[in-house]
């Protein structure tokens, strides 16, 4: 069974994914794939060429500034990254096709129209103020949060495609209890 985990920006998807998959099955993380891409020279060369970045240092910071100056750069970046993430996802699915449960954390699952690839989809949500606080703690800022948040579909639209909506506004203990209660139905 393929279980998708998605949600609003900085809603706790990574934490939820780790809770759900822990001891239950393998976990694919689109964010982890993207992070790995940035550590590869070939990818950085592509980024530097596509976005006219001369230096090899602080590429992510320079990209963030370029996105803030010109919102179309998000789409340009997504066109580079998404096919590479999908390729890694296909490898993951092939490798673990015989597992009872597999988990895939994909922030833009709905926007990428990947719903049909999943048996069950969890949606994580939290108040915008709490999500902003989490985003800033991870090194972002309010302006960038708003840019990324406005690029995504509204929660109300995304929720229509999901089987379970989990609000993450309390402790990790409460989140874990709520997630595992739902997951028991599929074990």
Each model region followed by its residue ranges:
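Small-molecule kinase domains that catalyze NTP-dependent phosphoryl transfer to phosphate-bearing small molecules
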Residues: 89, 97, 116-117, 128, ...
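Walker A/P-loop
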Residues: 14
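ATP-binding Walker
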Residues: 11
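ATP-dependent small-molecule kinase phosphotransfer cores
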Residues: 32, 36-98
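Short, well-ordered beta-strand core segments
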Residues: 27, 102, 119-123, 165-166
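The Walker A (P-loop) glycine that initiates the GxxxxGKT/S ATP-binding motif of P-loop NTPases
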Residues: 7, 19
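Post-Walker A helix-loop "phosphate-sensing" segment adjacent to the P-loop in P-loop NTPases
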Residues: 21-30
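Hydrophobic anchor at the beta1->P-loop junction of P-loop NTPases
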Residues: 3-5
């Amino acid at each position: 069974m393929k279980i998708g985990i998605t949600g609003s920006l900085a809603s706790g998807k990574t934490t939820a994914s780790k809770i759900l998959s822990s001891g239950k099955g393998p976990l694919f993380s689109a964010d982890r794939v993207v992070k790995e891409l940035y550590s590869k020279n070939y990818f950085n060369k592509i980024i530097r060429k596509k976005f006219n970045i001369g230096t090899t240092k602080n590429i992510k910071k320079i990209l963030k500034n370029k996105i803030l100056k010109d919102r179309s750069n998000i789409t340009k970046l997504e066109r580079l990254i998404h096919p590479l993430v999908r390729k890694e996802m296909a490898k993951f699915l092939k490798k673990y096709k015989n597992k009872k449960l597999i988990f895939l954390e994909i922030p833009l699952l709905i926007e990428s129209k990947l719903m049909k690839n999943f048996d069950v989809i969890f949606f994580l949500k939290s108040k915008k103020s709490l999500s902003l606080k989490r985003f800033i703690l991870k090194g972002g800022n309010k302006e960038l949060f708003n840019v990324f948040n406005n690029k995504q579909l509204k929660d109300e639209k995304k929720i229509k495609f999901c089987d379970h909506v989990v609000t993450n506004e309390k402790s990790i203990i409460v989140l874990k209890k709520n997630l595992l209660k739902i997951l028991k139905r599929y074990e």
